[in-house]
Amino acid sequence: MNNNLASLVSREDLGQLYHPFQPTYGYAGEYVDATHAALAESADQQTLVEFQGIDGFLRVADALKLYELAFFATGDVLEIGTHHGLSTAILSTAIRNSQHPDRMVHTIEISPTSVERARSHHKRLNVGDTIYYHAQPSTSVLSEFSATRQKFSLVFVDHDHSYAATIELLDSIEVLLEPGSLVLFHDYNDSRNTNSDDLEYGVFDAIEHSAPPSLKPFGTFGCCGLFLYDSSENKNYLS
């Protein structure tokens, strides 16, 4: 895998420097398949993506990275924050188009209204049978996963962006990860993270201050920060 360390951003760069999509995995060509290529053409670097009639808050680099990571993920995928189901649709479509279409996306969303809206989009796209919807607080669902030793090879975090919520997630995420898993944080590269008066955003600082040593920086793309899970750095790792 490519670590793309040259694309990392400093706190001063947040919301000022957006890196385009760069591949994490090795493959022939610029994109993994025709759907990935079409996604690249769906918006410019400054425009939010719409995918199959679903809108949201993804830049094209975010969407391309999600598709690539899900396409090559070897196990199930966890999404924390469904909203209207845009990123969920990208993840599940990538899985359907991959060589491992039996994998599942578990998506967590506290708003039942948002879950139903997302579910209707996914039914229309015929990807709903690859998605488990969890309409509960993320803390409850993650506790259940921990108790059952559920593991994921890819996690996309796009829920509560506050410092406290991100810290809480970082404290519980290692137990959910397979060795070599990737964790993608949305709104990691966002200028609102530097505004001390904006208590709704603190993703970057929370990761800088409290990410476990096992989460290694692996690049930034659009608004997203990517991290690789190195289980050798987790003294409490249980397979």
Region annotations inferred by a language model:
Residues 1-156, 160-239:
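A short alpha-helical cap/connector motif
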